Amino acid sequence: MNLKEKLFPENRLGLNRFWNFSRGGIDNFRTGLRDAVSGVEQTRSRMMEYDQLLVWAILSLMLIGLVMVYSASITLADGPKYANYSSNFFLIRHMISLAIAIGVGIWAFKIPTKVWDRYSPVIFGITVLLLIAVLIPGVGRGVNGAKRWIPLGLMNFQSSELMKFAAVIFAASYTVQRQEYLHSFVKGMLPMGIAVALVGGLLMAEPDMGAFVVVALIAFGILFLGGINAKLFGGLIAVGLMSGATMIAFSPLRRGRMLAFMDPWQVDNAANKGYQLTHSLMAFGRGEWFGTGLGGSVEKLHYLPEAHTDFIMAVIGEELGFVGVVVMIFLFYWIVRRAFLIGRTALQLDRSFAGLAAKGVAIWIGWQAFINMGVNLGLLPTKGLTLPLVSYGGSGILMNAVAMAMLLRIDFENRILMRGGKL
């Protein structure tokens, strides 16, 4: 002890108090820092439980769809068909549909994949009954000569959209259960062929050939990925092509659409069956590289029918240009790519149903987007298919959200298993 400490003992006491306080402060700081870092790691761990980029791609398409639906529909109230509606009518309805879809999607994400597997036959059967109900007078609602909707208050539910989802889970479950019979026509191919033919007959009675094409692609695409006999699959493709050609040949409406598709600029076609296609092509032409800007479309001013639904891609091409179209294609490519990768991972983890269901979602979204874009660009004959996650339509948005939720759930379960966890 030095002289100063002997003469002023209170200073020593003060120094000890200061040291104890400082040391306690440092310890508290370290504890707080450790807790903060632990919290960040836990948050990061929770964030890694799902594919963030996939979620952002889905939300981006929904947001672009909301903006473009508003842009494409804002002038519809000026026409006689929607004269009693406000200019914001379709925007508000689409916002409600998105809110319902996201809410249902969050709920669907909580459903384990094995539940979809267990109840897939029940869901498929209920959906078939709904397709029958649409055709019953007084139950189904007709629009533009087609009976495809069941009025449910906030939205007109389209049973064919539910059938696309039902086809994914039913075909995946069927393929897993019939794995040993996939090389047999009678026990492997025929039962699924009968189911698809039944659904096809109901959809063609509405009529909704576009939905039937998508359902058939989903069902037989999953069978192909599940390991069906190559010769049987080749025969199936041949039968499908011949059936399609027969339907076109014996249907004046479809035959006229095919002729208009082959030469849309012919005078009679341009004013009738090829009217939508020619104006869609003009919309893309006006858009050039960077588009005319949001709200700058001319074709949506009562020239291009169904600009906010089937032909929304043409409005995107006109207002956002080639760059906007490329962005849309990339977003769909990313979703389809991730869905196939998630499915492959599930199969590597011996989760056959989950893997095939994920790939079924990829087939659904990929083919429907391809067909819609192909129709808008004049690469395919006109079909009444919307652009997934983008076009106006409550049923389509709802079932797309459920499919995306199931896909994210499969990815979530994959990550749990890869970390050594249990489902």
UniProtKB/Swiss-Prot annotation:
Annotated Gene Ontology cellular component terms: cell division site; plasma membrane
Keywords: Cell cycle, Cell division, Cell inner membrane, Cell membrane, Cell shape, Cell wall biogenesis/degradation, Glycosyltransferase, Membrane, Peptidoglycan synthesis, Transferase, Transmembrane, Transmembrane helix
Residue ranges, Cytoplasmic side: 1-53, 110-119, 171-184, 230-231, 332-359, 408-423
GO process terms (BP): cell wall organization; FtsZ-dependent cytokinesis; peptidoglycan biosynthetic process; regulation of cell shape
Membrane topology (Periplasmic): 75-88, 141-149, 206-208, 253-310, 381-386
EC code: 2.4.99.28
Membrane topology label: Multi-pass membrane protein
GO molecular function terms attached to this record: lipid-linked peptidoglycan transporter activity; peptidoglycan glycosyltransferase activity
Record pathway: Cell wall biogenesis; peptidoglycan biosynthesis
Xref: InterPro entries: FtsW, FtsW/RodA
Subcellular location: Cell inner membrane
Top-level class of the enzyme under EC nomenclature: transferase
One Pfam family from the record: FTSW_RODA_SPOVE
Catalyzed chemical reaction(s): [GlcNAc-(1->4)-Mur2Ac(oyl-L-Ala-gamma-D-Glu-L-Lys-D-Ala-D-Ala)](n)-di-trans,octa-cis-undecaprenyl diphosphate + beta-D-GlcNAc-(1->4)-Mur2Ac(oyl-L-Ala-gamma-D-Glu-L-Lys-D-Ala-D-Ala)-di-trans,octa-cis-undecaprenyl diphosphate = [GlcNAc-(1->4)-Mur2Ac(oyl-L-Ala-gamma-D-Glu-L-Lys-D-Ala-D-Ala)](n+1)-di-trans,octa-cis-undecaprenyl diphosphate + di-trans,octa-cis-undecaprenyl diphosphate + H(+)
Residues that span the membrane, as ranges: 54-74, 89-109, 120-140, 150-170, 185-205, 209-229, 232-252, 311-331, 360-380, 387-407
HAMAP family hit by this protein: PGT_FtsW_proteobact
PANTHER family reported in the protein's UniProt record: CELL CYCLE PROTEIN, PEPTIDOGLYCAN GLYCOSYLTRANSFERASE FTSW-RELATED
Functional description taken from the UniProt entry: Peptidoglycan polymerase that is essential for cell division.
Listed name of the protein: Probable peptidoglycan glycosyltransferase FtsW
Organism of this sequence: Polynucleobacter necessarius subsp. necessarius (strain STIR1)
